[in-house]
Structure formats: C-alpha cells, structure tokens
From Swiss-Prot:
The lineage of its organism: Bacteria, Pseudomonadati, Pseudomonadota, Betaproteobacteria, Burkholderiales. Residues 95-97 are annotated as: Interaction with target base in tRNA. SUPFAM superfamilies: Adenine nucleotide alpha hydrolases-like. The record marks 125, 344 as: Interaction with tRNA. InterPro entries: MnmA-like, MnmA-like_C, MnmA-like_central, MnmA-like_central_sf, Rossmann-like_a/b/a_fold. This is tRNA-specific 2-thiouridylase MnmA. Residues 146-148, 308-309 are annotated as: Interaction with tRNA.
Length: 383
C-alpha cells in the first residue's frame, strides 16, 4: 500500500522539526522542504538562512527523510515585500507574516509540494483544521498561549483542505520535550522572533534602507508642537519607545505615545498617558477581507475579535457595509480597544473557530467612540 505523501515546511526550528518527526512516526511518506524567502543582503549578522539550512539537513538525516530547498525570494518580494513597503509609505503598519502565509507558505509552497506528488502539506504552526459537513474550519490551537490562527486567517477552503497542523493539539512544552527525547540537534534552539526577513536587526535601520526619511512636526491634540519626527513611516500607533520625548514640564509627566498621523500635513500626533482617549477605539472599519468559509458572518452577529497578535478576543458586533458590492465590514466593541492600528489585521472568532477577517482601514477614537473635537481631518484612515 502506497503511503500518503506529506511535504513539511521545515525552517530549521524545533516546531517544524517535531512536526516532520510526528508525521514520519504516523506512517506518512514525509518530504521536508526548506523555503528561502529572502536573499541575504548583508554579512550574515542578522540573517540565519545558512545555519537554518544546516539544521534542517541535520534533522532530516536523524529522522530519515528526504529534504530539499526551494527559493521563493522573487515571489516573496513581488507578493509580500512590495506590499509591505507600499503600506508603510502610506503611513500604515502592515503585518507581512499574514500575507506571507497566504501568498507564499500556503500558495507558492503548496503548489510546489503538489508538484512533488504530495497529497497534503504540513507546517509547525500552532492551529487546527477540522472538517465538518464537507467544509473545513480553522481553529485555535489547544495551547492558546501559542495559538497562531491570527496569522492564518486568510487561508481559504482549498488551502485548508490540503493542510495539516500536527502541533495544534500539543502544548509547546511537550514539543520541547519530544525534541529532547528523540535527540534533535536543534532541540535547544530559540524560537524565531520578529519579521522573518528583518531578523533581529533594528527595525528602523532596516526600513530606512528602502524608505527615505521625511521630517515633520510632532504635535499634541491641541496643536502644540513638541518635537520633530523623521518620517511618518517610521512610527506606529501606540508606540512609546523611540519617539524622542520625555515627560514635558508643563504636561502630565506621563510617557508619550503615538496617537495619529496626518498624511496631508506630514504631522505626527502624540499624547501623554496610556489611557488617553485618542488611544482608545470603540469602532473600526476593515477592508481587503478574507473569510475562511467563503462568506462573512451575518450582519449584527456577535463575535470575538483580535486587532493584534496575542490579544484576548474582544467581544463585538459585526456589521456589513450598507452599499452593495462593498465587502468592507465594521466592528463595534463592547469596550474600547487600545491602539487599533490601520494596516494590521482584525481577525474574527466564534469561540475557537477563526472566521477570517480584514485589514484595518480606520478606527474611531475618543471618549464616546467618535473623533475628538479639533482632531486633524486627514488622519490615516480609508485607503
């Protein structure tokens, strides 16, 4: 009887290595595939591609599977990095990991795996896939502290039908134990952090390689100039570090936070205090939508939503756009949400089931969910 072939995306990390071992133990014909999505453009101080490949080969030798490398750098720059730069240039803060999953790991990678004769692909993501009544659902991992469904919310039925997440029902601590027990050479390797193509390098330094600085005024909500910024692209909503302001003598003395961007006047608005009303939003509008089931929730449906990774699901009401053909949606939260950021993803849940989501375009702020009087009219909002 021919074994079912599964191509596993192997990064050199512990999670994908244990994934490959588990599937091999379950009797699958496992092939490892290492993706190179970024061409190293420095001396290797920050990029770990070479060492990651060495780790993949070592793991494959230990567990007895074939492995190959594939270069998706061109696809990544066209489909992910170009959009990343466009969003930052427009003053928004994108999440390239969400787009990378949809366009590279579960599209280019999936297509390549099928060409290798695979029936299914698998990755080391912490999430689950469940088939119910002929449809596929994306669920949170049992270990909610490691759940990565937020980054996977743009996957569709075709992609989910060919995907396995073996770690979705295993706690991270157990994954580490398995790695040690079977003697994986990378058992003690640290989890990767940060955006994949940036590595551990300072983010502002990286971004400045591709986007020019464009200094402008830094103002408070009442219009007082308190400093100068280096370019709106280099700041994100809710940012505290790197603003260059201490507690002003005539202010509250509390820390400063980025609260808004006025693209037309190249002005960065900052406020003092974590609980300032400009940092709180009761409503948002999101576009560029993607629904796991292929269609949105019912208008007025109650759901939970995340506007950033690892945030607790916030209870809210879902609203469809009133105009026909407009796929955007709105969310009205039961409680104000902190630093809702245009460019980030608003991801919806019904309990453990991920429904999908969209890219945040705008968020209403203020004491009652509306913009405070005197706020600049051309803030980063709708595309």
């Amino acid at each position: 009887m021919t074994k079912r072939r599964v191509v596993v995306g192997m990064s050199g990390g512990v999670d994908s290595s244990v994934t490959a071992w588990l599937l091999k133990e379950q009797g699958y014909d496992v092939v490892g595939l290492f993706m190179k999505n970024w061409e190293d453009d420095d001396d290797g101080e920050y990029c770990s591609t070479r060492q990651d490949w060495i780790d993949v080969v070592s793991v494959a030798d230990l567990i007895g599977i074939d492995v190959e490398a594939v270069n998706f750098a061109a696809e990544y720059k066209d489909r992910v990095f170009a959009e990343f730069l466009r969003e930052y240039s427009a003053g928004r803060t994108p999440n390239p990991d969400v787009l990378c999953n949809a366009e590279i790991k579960f599209k280019a990678f999936l297509d390549h795996a099928m060409s290798l004769g695979a029936q299914t692909i698998a990755t080391g993501h912490y999430a689950r896939v469940r088939e119910r009544d002929g449809r596929f659902e994306l669920l949170k991992a049992f270990d909610h502290t490691k759940d990565q469904s937020y980054f996977l919310h743009r996957l569709n039925q075709a992609q989910l039908s060919k995907t396995m997440f073996p770690l979705g029902e295993i706690p991270k601590t157990r994954v580490r134990e398995i790695a040690a027990q079977i003697g994986l050479p990378n058992a003690k390797k640290k989890d990767s952090t940060g955006i994949c193509f940036i590595g551990e390098r300072p983010f502002r330094d990286f971004l400045n390689r591709y986007l020019p600085t464009k200094p402008g005024p830094m103002k408070t909500p009442d219009g007082k100039t308190v400093g100068e910024h280096i370019g709106l692209a280099f700041y994100t909503f809710g940012q505290r570090k790197g603003i260059g302001l201490g507690g002003s003598k005539d202010g509250s003395g509390e820390p400063w936070f980025v609260a808004a961007k006025d693209i037309a006047s190249n002005t960065l608005y900052v406020v003092q205090g974590h609980d300032h009303p400009w940092l709180r939003s009761r409503e948002l509008v999101a576009g560029n939508v993607s629904w796991v089931a292929g269609e949105p929730p019912a208008d007025g449906a109650r759901c939970g939503a995340k506007t950033r990774y690892r945030q607790a699901d916030a209870p809210c009401a879902f609203g469809r756009a009133a105009q026909a053909g407009d796929e955007r949606f709105s969310l009205v939260f039961d409680e104000p949400q902190w630093a809702v950021t245009p460019g980030q993803s608003a991801v919806l849940y019904d309990g453990d089931v991920c429904l999908g989501g969209g890219i945040i375009e705008s968020a209403a702020t203020g004491r009652a969910g509306t913009a405070p009087a005197g706020r600049a009219p051309a803030l980063v909002e709708a595309r």
